[in-house]
């Protein structure tokens, strides 16, 4: 774990981190390294959109608007937003491990960056499409 300096976060991993519980040991160590500015965690645009939709639907409580949540998150330079590209959309369209479009876009972002994905999503892990951390 100590040698990993950068990764991409899945939505549930970021929400577990924000809630202060529920992360696996590898994920917790990586988020702590980011908090200490010893690692970089990329946050795909698909994660921002999914969190915003979940908050609007009342499925999660960020205790503030999603915009403020992400503005606060990105004040730490170790958290970097990662833009969606058309190539990622095409790559995501070719992924068939589940029917969740957010998962496909997030995996495509991690693949584009050639970085591991912080996730415990069983479909993603089982797909072996990329290295995962939990």
Show which residues each predicted segment covers:
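Phosphate/NTP-binding elements of NTP-utilizing enzymes
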Residues: 51
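Generic hydrophobic-segment detector
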Residues: 34-37, 48, 68, 82, ...
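Short, well-structured N-terminal submotif of metal-dependent ribonuclease cores
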Residues: 1-43, 57-72, 113, 123, ...
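Active-site neighborhoods of divalent-metal-dependent phosphate/nucleic-acid chemistry enzymes
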Residues: 61-64, 75-120
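Alpha-helix capping/helix-boundary segments
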Residues: 13, 47, 88, 106, ...
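Active-site regions of enzymes building and remodeling cell-envelope glycoconjugates
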Residues: 129-134
């Amino acid at each position: 774990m100590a040698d990993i300096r950068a990764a991409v976060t899945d939505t549930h991993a970021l929400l577990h981190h924000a809630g202060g519980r529920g992360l696996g040991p590898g994920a917790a160590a990586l988020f702590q390294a980011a908090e200490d500015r010893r690692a970089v965690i990329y946050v795909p645009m698909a994660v921002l959109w999914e969190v915003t939709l979940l908050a609007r639907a009342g499925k999660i409580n960020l205790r503030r608007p999603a915009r403020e949540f992400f503005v606060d998150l990105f004040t730490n330079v170790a958290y970097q937003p990662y833009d969606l590209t058309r190539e990622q959309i095409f790559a995501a369209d070719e992924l068939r491990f589940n029917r969740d479009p957010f998962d496909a876009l997030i995996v495509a972002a991690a693949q584009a960056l050639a970085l591991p994905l912080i996730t415990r999503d069983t479909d993603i892990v089982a797909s072996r499409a990329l290295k995962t951390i939990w």
